[in-house]
């Protein structure tokens, strides 16, 4: 159902203290479990240190590129038309694009086999930057699904 009143203003997120970046702050907030923000911050910054040691590249740039590579351009939504459910491809809004990229990076980092969450995050960032990794695979699977269902794009709403 649509809202009767005006649009809801998105909450302002204060940028993180180290890189002064809102996307880093959002990532840390999504990484946080049970309100333990200091733990999430430590994990994130430790992961960036691990990236620095492993690759020698700027870890912040690695993170930004990994996040950019993990963001989906299109996704599919189910739409019921005349008793048949179609998977309709739609373009992803920029806010949702960022949210999905962050969510996938965190989810697939947690599923990895490395020891310690910081090293899992670091490994996922490095792979995502290179264009491999589970988060990128998820993005590609969804893109392929949207491509396969392109015929139903006129059911968009």
Curated annotation (Swiss-Prot):
Keywords: Ribonucleoprotein, Ribosomal protein, RNA-binding, rRNA-binding, tRNA-binding. GO terms for molecular function: rRNA binding; structural constituent of ribosome; tRNA binding. Belongs to the universal ribosomal protein uS7 family. PANTHER family: RIBOSOMAL PROTEIN S7 (PTHR11205). Part of the 30S ribosomal subunit. Contacts proteins S9 and S11. One of the primary rRNA binding proteins, it binds directly to 16S rRNA where it nucleates assembly of the head domain of the 30S subunit. Is located at the subunit interface close to the decoding center, probably blocks exit of the E-site tRNA. This is Small ribosomal subunit protein uS7. It comes from Leptospira borgpetersenii serovar Hardjo-bovis (strain JB197).
């Amino acid at each position: 159902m649509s809202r009767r009143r005006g649009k809801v203003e998105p909450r302002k997120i204060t940028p993180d203290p180290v890189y002064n970046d809102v996307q880093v702050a959002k990532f840390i907030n999504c990484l946080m479990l049970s309100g333990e923000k200091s733990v999430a911050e430590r994990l994130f910054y430790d992961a960036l240190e691990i990236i620095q040691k492993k690759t020698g590249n700027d870890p912040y740039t690695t993170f930004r590129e990994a996040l950019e590579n993990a963001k989906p351009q299109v996704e599919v939504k189910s739409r019921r038309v005349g008793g048949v459910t179609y998977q309709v491809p739609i373009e992803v809004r920029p806010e949702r694009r960022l949210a999905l990229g962050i969510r996938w990076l965190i989810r697939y980092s947690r599923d990895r086999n490395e020891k310690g969450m910081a090293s899992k995050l670091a490994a996922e960032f490095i792979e995502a930057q290179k264009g491999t990794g589970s988060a990128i695979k998820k993005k590609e699977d969804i893109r392929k699904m949207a491509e396969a269902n392109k015929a139903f794009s006129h059911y968009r709403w």
